[in-house]
Amino acid sequence: MSKSIYEQYLQAKADNPGKYARDLATLMGISEAELTHSRVSHDAKRLKGDARALLAALEAVGEVKAITRNTYAVHEQMGRYENQHLNGHAGLILNPRNLDLRLFLNQWASAFTLTEETRHGVRHSIQFFDHQGDALHKVYVTEQTDMPAWEALLAQFITTEIPELQLEPLSAPEVTEPTATDEAVDAEWRAMTDVHQFFQLLKRNNLTRQQAFRAVGNDLAYQVDNSSLTQLLNIAQQEQNEIMIFVGNRGCVQIFTGMIEKVTPHQDWINVFNQRFTLHLIETTIAESWITRKPTKDGFVTSLELFAADGTQIAQLYGQRTEGQPEQTQWRDEIARLNNKDIAA
């Protein structure tokens, strides 16, 4: 008799102590949402309602730890779900230097709450998944969380009905030819007055980010060595200027703003450990590192953008900047110290 998914999970967990649910699901050949669904009536419960309602209710629970990740990077931030703007398909939870999120809510498909026994004690969380079964965002209780408010939220949203997960395969992006010449893309780029116009430029011209970078002049985009992330984090830690680190997936982008306290490499990973923020990023998976300069009404905004071999954007880094103010000269100086990659090599 074949084992249930839950029994397979228990076996995989016993065989691979210390591995996270995401990794166990991969070993089992299923999505993390399917794995979590199998745990319902054990250490998980299904939550009803749409993501907006759940996110709005989280405002009452006080401080939590929020985790957003992709295959290559994990972004952990302590904060509160305050200052929410969740209209339409796009949403904001806007708390710079605290919990700062950009949400693409049409990607949010299911949610669960988990109560897990760990070697550090019981761990409570709410976890959101997309239509493909990948985790978009996770919310963990901390010592500062208002537990009566957390329990009240769960009482409101836990459902005894356990509908089947309606998973959809990820449609492969259409391979299309760019619709504009390199010269036209370069001219459009130079005409931008806001960094958010960049998405429209890509869409209009059927371009990926990297195709756009290759189309424009080296004063707008150029490649640097893949060690640049570690180099830049160390410089920012030494000089103590505020930077921004973006990590996202199909449905959520989480943003850190602040000074870097501690940078620690470990095996293939580069890690940042702050009191209220942690970054874990697999440095060996960085296939391309680009410096980009985008014009705004306040002058150019410079970023380091990191990509995996499959084209996934792993992370983006900026200097801290307030709307209406020019970019930090210190950030530009730090970027200028990075080693250019010899693209002809």
Swiss-Prot record:
BP terms from Gene Ontology: iron ion transport
UniProt KW keywords: Ion transport, Iron, Iron transport, Transport
Gene3D superfamilies from the UniProt entry: HemS/ChuS/ChuX like domains (3.40.1570.10)
SUPFAM superfamilies xrefs: Heme iron utilization protein-like
Membrane-traversing stretches: none
Family: To Y.pestis HmuS.
Role summary: Part of the binding-protein-dependent transport system for hemin.
Name of the protein described by the UniProt record: Hemin transport protein HemS
Species in which this protein is naturally found: Yersinia enterocolitica
Gene name linked to the record: hemS
